[in-house]
C-alpha cells in the first residue's frame, strides 16, 4: 500500500543503523553452498550467483535457487554476499559505491582457486548487471556463460518501489530524483542512482554518472574497447525479461532496450544505442547473445523453465534426464513460481484446507489469464523446455476473459490503487472496501492535528513500523501475486491491506483492555469491536475476491498485523511506565504544538469535555 513510502523508510532506517565502519570499503565474501552430493570432485565448472535488491544468499528463495543449481549441474555453487552479515548485505544493495564493491569481488574471485579455470554466472535483478560489469572489467572473472534474470542492463528511470498506476508515489520519487540524483555524493553512495538513466536529462546523466555510462560505453573512456572485447569472450549472454515486470522501469531495459520517454513506445535492442556502442550486434551475429521473455512479473517463472535454462547454459555434460525432472513438473500454478520452501508449505496448508472444503476451491491453472509468448525456437522447445507446450496451452485463453482495456477501467490512487469494471457493481463495491485503510489513514492525520494527543501519534507510528515490516517480509519471501491480476504490483506475501487492518483491530481492542478494562466488556465496547472486525473482514475479503492476493497472503497478513498491534500496545505502555513519553512531551517541538498525553489517564474524556463546554456556555449566557 505504501510501496514508495516503504522504500524511503527503509532508506532512512538504514542510515539510522549505519555503523561508522560502513564508510570504509565493505567486506565482500563468497559463500559456498554445500550439499550432500558430489560437490568437490566434479570437473563441472562452478556457478557464481549474485542476488538482487533487498535479498541475501541465505534467504529462502536464494537458498533454494542455489541448491537447485547445484543439484542440476552437480558442481560447486558460490553466492556473493556483501558485508559481514545479512543486514549489511541488504544495506549494501542500497548504499555503497559499486566500483569499490566490484573491485573487492574481483580480488576475491582471483584468490579462489576453484574459479581460476572459469565459471558460469547467474544474476538476479540488479545482481545480473553487476555480474556483467565483472565480466567487462575484471580479468580474474573468467565467465563462460552469464544468465541475467530481470536485470536492468540499460538502467532504470525511476527508483524501484512505485506501482505503475500509483501516480502520487511516482510524482514524489521523480521530484526527489530531479532535486538530487546527479549530486556527486548520491552518485557515489546510492546504488540505484549509479545505474539511473533518463533521456530527459541526458546531458546531466552523461556528465555525472560514472558507472553506467562507462559500463555501457555511452561516453568515450579508457576502457571503451576493452568493454566490447571482454563481452565477446563470453560463450553465452542470456538476458531474461518478464513481460509484466513491475520492479524494473522501463522493463525493456532487462533486454538491452529502452523506452521513448515522450511517447512511451518500446525501443527494441536493435534500435537502441547499446546495440552498436557495446558491440551487441556482433554478439547477436555470433550467436552469443539471446534475449528470452517470460509472461510473468519480476522474477516470476516456472521451476521447469528455470531448470531448462540452467541445463542448457551451465551444464558441461548434457544429460537426457536430470534427477529434478519429475519433482519440477507442476501440480498447480502456485508451486511453479520462484518461491521459498516456507511459502510453499503455507500454500500446502491451504491446499489441505481446500481439500477439507473449509475454503472455496482454488482456481485451476488453465483458468488463469496469461499472454502467449514464444521464448525459444520451435526446434529447441521440445528438447530444452519440456514444459513449454503445456504452459502455452494452459495460457492460451480467450481474450474476452482477460482484463478490459485501460480506457474501460476506473481507478483511484491515493497511496494505493484499485481497478474495477465500470459495469460491475460487485467488483466496484469490493474496490471501495479496499480504500478503508486509506480512509483510516486520513482519520489518523485528522485526529493527530486536531486532538494533538501523543497516543494517536504513537498509534500512527506503529502503523508506519507495521508497513516497514510488511515491506521487509515481502522482499525476503518474494512470493508473487495471482497471475491473472493485470495491475497488482510488487510481491504479494503478506497483504499490506490485511496487515494494516490486523494492526488497527488489535491495537484498538488491546488499548481498550489496557486502559479501559472496566468498560471493555460492555455492550458498547463489543459493538465497537464488531465494527473493527467487520471492517477488517471487508478489506481482507476484497483483496482476495478481487484477485490481488492469494488467500494465504491475506490470512498471514492479518495475523502479522494483529501480532504487531498487540506488541505495539505493550511497547507504548512500557514507554509510559519508563517515563519515555514524559520526556518526549518535554521536547520543545512537542511543547510548541501543545502535544499532550491525557487520553490514557482520563476516562470518559469526550463526555467530560462536552460537560465543560456546556458549563462554559451556560456561564457565558448568564
From Swiss-Prot:
Q: What happens when the gene is disrupted?
A: Cells show lethality and the dolichyldiphosphatase domain alone can rescue the lethal phenotype, but the growth rate of these cells is slower than in wild-type cells. Cells containing wild-type palmitoyl-protein thioesterase (PPT) and inactivated dolichyldiphosphatase reverse the growth retardation phenotype. Cells containing no functional copy of palmitoyl-protein thioesterase are viable, but abnormally sensitive to sodium orthovanadate and elevated external pH.
The chain's Cytoplasmic topological domains, given as residue ranges, are 427-428, 512-519, 574-622
**Localization, UniProt:** Vacuole; Endoplasmic reticulum membrane
Primary location class: other
Positions of transmembrane segments: 406-426, 429-449, 489-511, 520-540, 553-573
Disulfide cross-links? 106-138
Report what the Swiss-Prot or TrEMBL entry states about this protein's PTMs.
Proteolytically cleaved, possibly by krp1.
Which residues get glycosylated? 223, 260, 396
Site: Crucial for post-translational processing. Where?
373
The molecular function terms in GO held by this entry are: dolichyldiphosphatase activity; palmitoyl-(protein) hydrolase activity
The reaction(s) catalysed by this protein are:
S-hexadecanoyl-L-cysteinyl-[protein] + H2O = L-cysteinyl-[protein] + hexadecanoate + H(+); a di-trans,poly-cis-dolichyl diphosphate + H2O = a di-trans,poly-cis-dolichyl phosphate + phosphate + H(+)
Which keywords does this chain's UniProt record carry?
Disulfide bond, Endoplasmic reticulum, Glycoprotein, Hydrolase, Membrane, Signal, Transmembrane, Transmembrane helix, Vacuole
Enumerate the active-site residues: 125, 245, 298
Q: What is its EC number?
A: 3.1.2.22, 3.6.1.43
Tell me what effect the entry lists for residue 245 to A. Sensitive to vanadate and elevation of external pH
Q: Fetch the InterPro entries from UniProt.
A: AB_hydrolase_fold (IPR029058), Dolichyldiphosphatase_PAP2 (IPR039667), P_Acid_Pase_2/haloperoxi_sf (IPR036938), P_Acid_Pase_2/haloperoxidase (IPR000326)
| SUPFAM superfamilies, A to Z | Acid phosphatase/Vanadium-dependent haloperoxidase (SSF48317), alpha/beta-Hydrolases (SSF53474)
Instruction: Quote the annotated effect of residue 373 to A.
Output: Abolished cleavage of the linker domain
Q: Which PANTHER family match?
A: DOLICHYLDIPHOSPHATASE 1, PALMITOYL-PROTEIN THIOESTERASE/DOLICHYLDIPHOSPHATASE 1
Family listed: In the N-terminal section; belongs to the palmitoyl-protein thioesterase family.
Q: What is this protein called?
A: Palmitoyl-protein thioesterase-dolichyl pyrophosphate phosphatase fusion 1
The record lists the organism as: Schizosaccharomyces pombe (strain 972 / ATCC 24843) (Fission yeast)
Q: What lineage, starting at the top, does this entry show?
A: Eukaryota, Fungi, Dikarya, Ascomycota, Taphrinomycotina
Amino acid at each position: 500500500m505504501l510501496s514508495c513510502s516503504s522504500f524511503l523508510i527503509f532508506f532512512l532506517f538504514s542510515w539510522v543503523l549505519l555503523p561508522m565502519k560502513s564508510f570504509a570499503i565493505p567486506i565482500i565474501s563468497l559463500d559456498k553452498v554445500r550439499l550432500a552430493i558430489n560437490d568437490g570432485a566434479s570437473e563441472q565448472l562452478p556457478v557464481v550467483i549474485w542476488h538482487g535488491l533487498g535479498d541475501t544468499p541465505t534467504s529462502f528463495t536464494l537458498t533454494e535457487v542455489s541448491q537447485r543449481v547445484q543439484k542440476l549441474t552437480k558442481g560447486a555453487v558460490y553466492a556473493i554476499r556483501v558485508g559481514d552479515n545479512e543486514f549489511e548485505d541488504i544495506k549494501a544493495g542500497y548504499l555503497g559505491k559499486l566500483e569499490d564493491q566490484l573491485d573487492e569481488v574481483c580480488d576475491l574471485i582471483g584468490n579462489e582457486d576453484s574459479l581460476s579455470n572459469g565459471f558460469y554466472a547467474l544474476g538476479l535483478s540488479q545482481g545480473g548487471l553487476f555480474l556483467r560489469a565483472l565480466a567487462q572489467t575484471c580479468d580474474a572473472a573468467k565467465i563462460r556463460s552469464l544468465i541475467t534474470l530481470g536485470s536492468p542492463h540499460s538502467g532504470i528511470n525511476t527508483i524501484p518501489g512505485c506501482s505503475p498506476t500509483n501516480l502520487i508515489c511516482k510524482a514524489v520519487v521523480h521530484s526527489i530524483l530531479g532535486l538530487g540524483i546527479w549530486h556527486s555524493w548520491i552518485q557515489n553512495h546510492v546504488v540505484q542512482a549509479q545505474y539511473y538513466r533518463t533521456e530527459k536529462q541526458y546531458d546531466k546523466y552523461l556528465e555525472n554518472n560514472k558507472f553506467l555510462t562507462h559500463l555501457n560505453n555511452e561516453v568515450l573512456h579508457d576502457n571503451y574497447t576493452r568493454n566490447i572485447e571482454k563481452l565477446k569472450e563470453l560463450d553465452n549472454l542470456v538476458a531474461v525479461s518478464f513481460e509484466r515486470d513491475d520492479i524494473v522501469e522501463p522493463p525493456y531495459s532487462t533486454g538491452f532496450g529502452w523506452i521513448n520517454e515522450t511517447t512511451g513506445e518500446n525501443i527494441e535492442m536493435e534500435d537502441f544505442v547499446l546495440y552498436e556502442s557495446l558491440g551487441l550486434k556482433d554478439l547477436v551475429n555470433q550467436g552469443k547473445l539471446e534475449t528470452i521473455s517470460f509472461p510473468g512479473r519480476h522474477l516470476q517463472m516456472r521451476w521447469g523453465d528455470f531448470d531448462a535454462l540452467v541445463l542448457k547454459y551451465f551444464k558441461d555434460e548434457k544429460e537426457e534426464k536430470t534427477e529434478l525432472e519429475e519433482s519440477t513438473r507442476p501440480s498447480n500454478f502456485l508451486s511453479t513460481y520462484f518461491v521459498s520452501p516456507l511459502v510453499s508449505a503455507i500454500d500446502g496448508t491451504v491446499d489441505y484446507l481446500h481439500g477439507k472444503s473449509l475454503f472455496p476451491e482454488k482456481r485451476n491453472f488453465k483458468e488463469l489469464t496469461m499472454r502467449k509468448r514464444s521464448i525459444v525456437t520451435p526446434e529447441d522447445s521440445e528438447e530444452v523446455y519440456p514444459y513449454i507446450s503445456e504452459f502455452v496451452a494452459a495460457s492460451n485463453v480467450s481474450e474476452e476473459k482477460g482484463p478490459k482495456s485501460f480506457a474501460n477501467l476506473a481507478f483511484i490512487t491515493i497511496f494505493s490503487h484499485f481497478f474495477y469494471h465500470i459495469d460491475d457493481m460487485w467488483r466496484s463495491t469490493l474496490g471501495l472496501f479496499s480504500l478503508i485503510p486509506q480512509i483510516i489513514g486520513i482519520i489518523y492525520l485528522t485526529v493527530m492535528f486536531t486532538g494533538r494527543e501523543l497516543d494517536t501519534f504513537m498509534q500512527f507510528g506503529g502503523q508506519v513500523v507495521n508497513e516497514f515490516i510488511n515491506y521487509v517480509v515481502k522482499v525476503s519471501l518474494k512470493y508473487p501475486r495471482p497471475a491473472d491480476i493485470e495491475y497488482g504490483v510488487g510481491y504479494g506475501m503478506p497483504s499490506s491491506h490485511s496487515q494494516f487492518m490486523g494492526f488497527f483491530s488489535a491495537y484498538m481492542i488491546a488499548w481498550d483492555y489496557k486502559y479501559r478494562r472496566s468498560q471493555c466488556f460492555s455492550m458498547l465496547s463489543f459493538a465497537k469491536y464488531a465494527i473493527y472486525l467487520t471492517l477488517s473482514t471487508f478489506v481482507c475479503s476484497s483483496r482476495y475476491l478481487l484477485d490481488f492476493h492469494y488467500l494465504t497472503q491475506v490470512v498471514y497478513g492479518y495475523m502479522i498485523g494483529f501480532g504487531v498491534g498487540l506488541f505495539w500496545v505493550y511497547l507504548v505502555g512500557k514507554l509510559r511506565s519508563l517515563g519515555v513519553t514524559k520526556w518526549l512531551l518535554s521536547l520543545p517541538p512537542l511543547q510548541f504544538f501543545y502535544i499532550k498525553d491525557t487520553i490514557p489517564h482520563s476516562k470518559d474524556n469526550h463526555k467530560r469535555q462536552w460537560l465543560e463546554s456546556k458549563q462554559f456556555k451556560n456561564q457565558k449566557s448568564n
